[in-house]
Each structure stands twice: as C-alpha cells, then as structure tokens.
C-alpha cells in the first residue's frame, strides 16, 4: 500500500481525505490510501514517519507549515526562501526514511495569476504559511505588499 496523508493539529475541517480517496478511485489506484494524522505537537512528526513504513508523502497544515522545517532532512530552495513547507515527500530505503519539504502554494499562487495583470500594490490577509508563499511571489514581482 502507498500511504499519503495530512498532518495538522485539528483536522475536523479537512476535506483532504475524501478528496484524495475519490481521486485515487477515479485514477484506478487501489494501492493508494490517504489518512489524516492529528498531531498534538510537531515533535510527533518523526515518530509518525518512522512508525508508518508505507507513508510516502504528507500535506502539512496549520500550525505546522513552519515548525516542521527543522525536522526535515532536506528543504527545497523555494520552500526555504518562503520559510514554510506544505508538502513532504518521503523517500524510503529499507528502514531508512529521507524527508524533503516543498511549498506548492508558491506555484499555485503564481499560476492563479497567469494571464492577469500583476498588481502594483496588494494587501495580504493572514500570517500563516500560505500567506508567506503569497508574499514571496508578490515580492518577486516587486509588488508593494502589506501583511495584516
């Protein structure tokens, strides 16, 4: 079985498990499973990876997008620049696991503005990992932006 999942503190609001279960079924991937992993503290991350040998990838949500970074073996250059990770890929070699963090919010935000005029000013609401990705893109485009 190829396991994937979402980690966060409280996941009752999440539709990720339903979404990915339907996606795996639609793509005829009975070998894939998506689970929710509520962690009371990010220090539980390494034990989660260690105790689930079929776990190959995780989405990261509130409040762990920033605090997971020091626990990873490697962080993608863009995710390091943003200071937030929302996706972790887990490479397995026997019992050993190598974790690599990425930030897919950056590319998602860039693509959402493709074909649109880039603003000269922007107000970003929120202070979490997704807001950090938005600010990163706007600053790359020399947009005068404020964070609230």
Language model features with spans:
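Glycine-rich adenosine-cofactor-binding loop
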Residues: 8, 103-106, 113-114, 119-141
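Phosphate/diphosphate ligand-binding glycine-rich loop within oxidoreductases
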Residues: 2-116
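NAD(P)-binding Rossmann-fold cofactor-contacting core
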Residues: 141-148
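Short coil/turn segments at beta-strand junctions that form active-site/ligand-binding loops
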Residues: 53-56, 120-121, 143
């Amino acid at each position: 079985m190829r396991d994937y999942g979402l980690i966060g503190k409280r996941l009752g609001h999440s539709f990720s498990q339903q979404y990915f279960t339907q996606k795996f079924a639609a793509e005829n991937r009975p070998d894939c499973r998506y689970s929710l992993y509520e962690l009371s503290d990010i220090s539980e991350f390494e034990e989660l990876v260690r105790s689930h040998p079929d776990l190959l990838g995780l989405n990261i949500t509130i409040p762990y997008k920033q605090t997971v970074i020091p626990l990873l073996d490697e962080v993608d250059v863009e995710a390091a620049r943003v200071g937030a990770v929302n996706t972790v890929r887990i490479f397995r070699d026997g019992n050993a696991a190598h974790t690599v963090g990425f930030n897919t919010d950056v590319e998602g935000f860039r693509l959402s503005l493709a074909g649109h005029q880039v603003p000269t000013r922007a107000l970003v609401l929120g202070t979490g990992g997704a807001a950090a990705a938005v600010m990163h893109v706007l600053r790359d485009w020399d947009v005068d932006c404020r964070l609230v």
